[in-house]
Amino acid sequence: MQFSKMHGLGNDFVVVDGVTQNVFFTPETIRRLANRHCGIGFDQLLIVEAPYDPELDFHYRIFNADGSEVSQCGNGARCFARFVTLKGLTNKKDISVSTQKGNMVLTVKDDNQIRVNMGEPIWEPAKIPFTANKFEKNYILRTDIQTVLCGAVSMGNPHCVVQVDDIQTANVEQLGPLLESHERFPERVNAGFMQIINKEHIKLRVYERGAGETQACGSGACAAVAVGIMQGLLNNNVQVDLPGGSLMIEWNGVGHPLYMTGEATHIYDGFITL
């Protein structure tokens, strides 16, 4: 099997062309490949498939390092666009793809940046999914070590966002896994820890569902900005600094799609026997 190793701000991926080669992965195979000592090593495995809908260009599948399939990965989407362009699978600047939860448009810009239309943030608790009677801008979550206020939103995958005073000292290691597996998120959740620098600049760390804390989480950056805007804390264009680098997020509010812009880097190509 041919593959490419890529990263978006240090969030690393193995990307596989499932259009020109037949590929099938069991969860056990994915876990073995994800092992950084005995396999290739990655946060997520991305598979490019032929479109399920003839109106679209590709279908986009995402698997976490633990073998679980998920519906969205923003950093992965940028790498997906870079991959299909590099491999000559398309020459379009605007690439339309489907995911488990909907469609996306990925735009390859002239400055080497990728702009992703992430769709509209989803706030209805049942659709996140999150257990709550109605939408609120802040929810109280109780864990074994502390009670937190958080925003909850789906960007095609579930996110909870907690505001912290200092990103460096935030208790991500302990609180992250407790939020990820919190009973009010039946499909688990990506936990974001956001420090607001000003209305157009935040710092963020994300404990990702099925992957742990990563260098960057694109959908997590989108979720944090969406929550901050809904809570009246942020403007419509925000720079998000993650451990691996920065993203620009734009959102004009309810009824509008949210856009993420950032880099996608090709590291190397390889061949492995499964």
UniProtKB/Swiss-Prot annotation:
InterPro entries: DAP_epimerase_AS, DAP_epimerase_DapF. GO terms for molecular function: diaminopimelate epimerase activity. The keyword Amino-acid biosynthesis applies. The active site is at 73 (proton donor), 217 (proton acceptor). The record marks 159, 208 as: Could be important to modulate the pK values of the two catalytic cysteine residues. Keywords: Amino-acid biosynthesis, Cytoplasm, Isomerase, Lysine biosynthesis. Its EC number is 5.1.1.7. Coiled coil: none annotated. Its main location: cytoplasm. Inhibited by LL-aziridino (LL-AziDAP), DL-aziridino (DL-AziDAP). Also inhibited by (2S,3R,6S)-2,6-diamino-3-fluoropimelate (L,L-3-fluoro-DAP) and (2R,3S,6S)-2,6-diamino-3-fluoropimelate (D,L-3-fluoro-DAP). It is found in: Cytoplasm. Changing residue 217 to S: Enzymatically active, but it adopts a more open conformation. It is able to catalyze both epimerization of DAP and HF elimination of L,L-3-fluoro-DAP and D,L-3-fluoro-DAP. Able to slowly eliminate HF but does not catalyze epimerization. The keyword Magnesium does not apply. The record marks 268 as: Important for dimerization. GO terms for biological process: lysine biosynthetic process via diaminopimelate. SUPFAM superfamilies: Diaminopimelate epimerase-like (SSF54506). Substrate binds at residues 11, 44, 64, 74-75, 157, 190, 208-209, 218-219. DapF utilizes a two-base mechanism involving a pair of cysteine residues (Cys-73 and Cys-217). Belongs to the diaminopimelate epimerase family. Homodimer (Potential). Previously DapF has been proposed to be a monomer, however it seems that it adopts a dimeric structure. Catalyzes the stereoinversion of LL-2,6-diaminopimelate (L,L-DAP) to meso-diaminopimelate (meso-DAP), a precursor of L-lysine and an essential component of the bacterial peptidoglycan. Only accepts DAP isomers with the L configuration. This is Diaminopimelate epimerase. It comes from Haemophilus influenzae (strain ATCC 51907 / DSM 11121 / KW20 / Rd).
